[in-house]
Amino acid sequence: MIASLRGTVLDIQLDHAVLECAGVGYKVLATPAMLGTLQRGEEARVMTTLVVKEDSMTLYGFTSQDDRDMFHVLQTVSGLGPKLALAALSVMSAGDLAQAIAGEEAARLQKIPGVGKRVAQRLILELKDKVKAFAPAESADLSSAAPAAAGPVVEDVVEALIGLGFTDKMARPVVESVVAEQPDAATPVVLRAALSQLGAKK
């Protein structure tokens, strides 16, 4: 398993970054919070896990060991794959997820895109005892992320939310509202804020 990568950040997109290590570019899928810590042209070290399927090999990147461990724990739930596990960590940290699961906060878990009442109940039932080891995580400081132009940000974030299962009609007003309140916010910051608001409306 590829447990970590250290190299130069070549590219940063809405859902992934490309790190060049020893002349090889690795595409790493990650949460908005993790992507917000990277800067093009600078060296970075990213904790990773490799998910191997019959037709693909995908790298996922994390800001902390807890997030990576939670990524694996979430996938022990029947019917929950890496895409949904990453979506969960895009909305809440490992510590916050652990609190919600241990506290049987089904409504809070339903803020995660793709998680309805039944999946939330399965998370609680199957993981309540497994998440006790996760300490509450401090809120990530997203204010240091580089600013981006508001126009492209709206379109990019709406596109990312549609990819997560939201409709344009649901996503666009929320994204535009977030950008209006935080006109200098970077794309990962806007995406995370929009995810939180959309989850609260479910």
Swiss-Prot record:
User: Where the protein is mainly located, per its record?
Assistant: cytoplasm
Q: Where is this region: Domain III?
A: 149-202
Question: Record keywords: Phosphoprotein included?
Answer: no
Q: Which domain of life is it from?
A: Bacteria
Gene Ontology BP term (one): DNA repair
| Sorted UniProt keywords | Cytoplasm, DNA damage, DNA recombination, DNA repair, DNA-binding
GO CC terms in record: cytoplasm; Holliday junction helicase complex; Holliday junction resolvase complex
Ranges for the region named Flexible linker are 143-148
Q: Give the start-end ranges of region Domain II.
A: 64-142
> What GO terms are given for molecular function?
ATP binding; four-way junction DNA binding; four-way junction helicase activity
Provide the transmembrane region boundaries.
Answer: none
> What is annotated about its quaternary structure and interactions?
Homotetramer. Forms an RuvA(8)-RuvB(12)-Holliday junction (HJ) complex. HJ DNA is sandwiched between 2 RuvA tetramers; dsDNA enters through RuvA and exits via RuvB. An RuvB hexamer assembles on each DNA strand where it exits the tetramer. Each RuvB hexamer is contacted by two RuvA subunits (via domain III) on 2 adjacent RuvB subunits; this complex drives branch migration. In the full resolvosome a probable DNA-RuvA(4)-RuvB(12)-RuvC(2) complex forms which resolves the HJ.
Q: Tell me the domain comment.
A: Has three domains with a flexible linker between the domains II and III and assumes an 'L' shape. Domain III is highly mobile and contacts RuvB.
Question: Which family, according to the similarity comment?
Answer: Belongs to the RuvA family.
What name does the UniProt record give this protein? Holliday junction branch migration complex subunit RuvA
